[in-house]
């Protein structure tokens, strides 16, 4: 159960950008974008969303929680796979409408539900006038059927 609450963002832009209060600016759906990188090597792992409850739980527990837009529910990262994200640092951008989590991943060291370390395992390019995807990291850190069958 969350106990932390967030004050409304200040009207004064200077206070928002340089003041000491963390006053996240959630969008019209009550969400804030979270960029997640590895605390050790800086690799981009995922982009997700948090509602106030997920953000509060993350701050209170030190474990990353997100809001799933597709499932419309709170989710503790790694609750099914065991790849829990321990939060080492949280930063916010200048206008406090996005956050950056630096995490250490437990379990199989995989963040993506596909079993890969990162959700960003493909590059985007153009081939013969068509946008194409190329897989650049095809290493699976765990067996999907085994891990998700256990949950």
Curated annotation (Swiss-Prot):
What name goes with this protein? Phosphoribosyl-AMP cyclohydrolase
Major location category of this protein: cytoplasm
Q: Which gene encodes it?
A: hisI
Origin organism is Sinorhizobium medicae (strain WSM419) (Ensifer medicae)
**Family the entry assigns:** Belongs to the PRA-CH family.
Share an example GO biological-process annotation for this protein: L-histidine biosynthetic process
Q: What does the entry list under GO cellular component?
A: cytoplasm
Tell me which residues bind Mg(2+).
93, 95, 97
Compartments where found = Cytoplasm
What Enzyme Commission number does this protein have? 3.5.4.19
């Amino acid at each position: 159960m969350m106990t932390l609450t967030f004050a409304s963002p200040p009207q004064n832009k200077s206070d928002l950008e340089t003041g000491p209060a963390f006053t996240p600016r959630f969008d019209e759906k009550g969400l804030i974008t979270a960029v997640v990188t590895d605390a050790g090597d800086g690799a981009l792992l995922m982009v997700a969303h948090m509602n106030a409850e997920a953000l509060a739980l993350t701050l209170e527990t030190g474990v990353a929680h997100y809001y799933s837009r597709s499932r419309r529910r709170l989710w503790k990262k790694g609750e099914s796979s065991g790849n829990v994200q321990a939060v080492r640092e949280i930063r916010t951008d200048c206008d406090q409408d996005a956050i950056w989590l630096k995490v250490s991943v437990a379990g199989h060291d995989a963040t993506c539900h596909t079993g890969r370390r990162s959700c960003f395992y493909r590059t985007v390019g153009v081939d013969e006038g068509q946008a194409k995807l190329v897989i650049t990291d095809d290493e699976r850190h765990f067996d999907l059927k085994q891990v998700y069958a256990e949950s």
